[in-house]
């Protein structure tokens, strides 16, 4: 039934809004909805072809009804496509402002997936097939958009070097906090000196010095 696939895209978009990350791009579903739009457009042209530009809806109510249904289906599919891509674009911009490098996160995830799959390459008898780690959760257009938006944001932030425009608008409750290191990040320079971020270590640091690292997933704030 026309419109069902477009509704699936809307459901994906709604779920994306409640996630902290960006789920995989629905390439096949988007292509199928776009193909449905083209098919409906061909149906419109086929229905209008016999009239050679002199169609009168009052004289051909059945044809007029078919044209209306096809046209409304096309418009709805287009709105679903636009809504899906708009939500993903807003999520990319949100992650960019939080300082999360989506492309770098994908590469790290892909490397982990590849390592986990090596042990099971010879176990064909199980019939299980893992997802390729090389698959990107972004479309090529989204990757390009993220790079260009990141560059634009960096240029914009460069005008105010003394102000962190991507920082939280809410002041921290405590000036210093306890954190646990989730991933090795090496040494970082802070106002109070150099701290070494080694995985599983716990530190008592100034909130402003590690706020970005918490957002990027390197650190976890302890209650």
Swiss-Prot record:
Residues 122-139 have a biased composition (Polar residues). Keywords: DNA replication, Nucleus. GO terms for cellular component: CMG complex; GINS complex; nuclear replication fork. It comes from the Eukaryota. Pfam families: PSF1_C (PF24997), Sld5 (PF05916). Residues 110-142 are annotated as: Disordered. The GINS complex plays an essential role in the initiation of DNA replication. This is DNA replication complex GINS protein psf1.
């Amino acid at each position: 039934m026309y419109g069902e696939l477009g509704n699936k895209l809307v459901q994906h978009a709604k779920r994306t809004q409640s996630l902290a990350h960006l789920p995989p791009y629905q390439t096949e579903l988007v292509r199928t909805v776009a193909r449905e739009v083209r098919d409906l457009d061909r149906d419109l042209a086929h229905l209008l072809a016999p009239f050679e530009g002199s169609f009168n809806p009052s004289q051909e109510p059945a044809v007029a009804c078919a044209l209306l249904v096809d046209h409304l289906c096309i418009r709805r599919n287009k709105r679903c496509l636009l809504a899906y891509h708009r939500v993903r674009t807003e999520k990319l911009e949100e992650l960019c402002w939080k300082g999360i490098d989506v492309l770098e996160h994908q590469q790290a995830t892909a490397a982990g997936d590849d390592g986990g799959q090596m042990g099971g390459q010879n176990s064909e008898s199980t019939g299980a097939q893992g997802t390729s780690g090389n698959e990107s959760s972004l479309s090529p257009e989204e990757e390009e958009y993220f790079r260009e938006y990141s560059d634009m944001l960096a240029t914009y932030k460069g005008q105010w070097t003394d102000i962190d425009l991507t920082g939280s608008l809410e002041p921290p409750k405590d000036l210093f906090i306890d954190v646990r290191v989730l991933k090795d990040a090496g040494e970082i320079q802070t106002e109070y000196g150099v701290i070494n971020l080694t995985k599983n270590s716990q530190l008592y640091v100034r909130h402003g010095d590690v706020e970005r690292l918490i957002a990027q997933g390197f650190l976890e704030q302890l209650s």
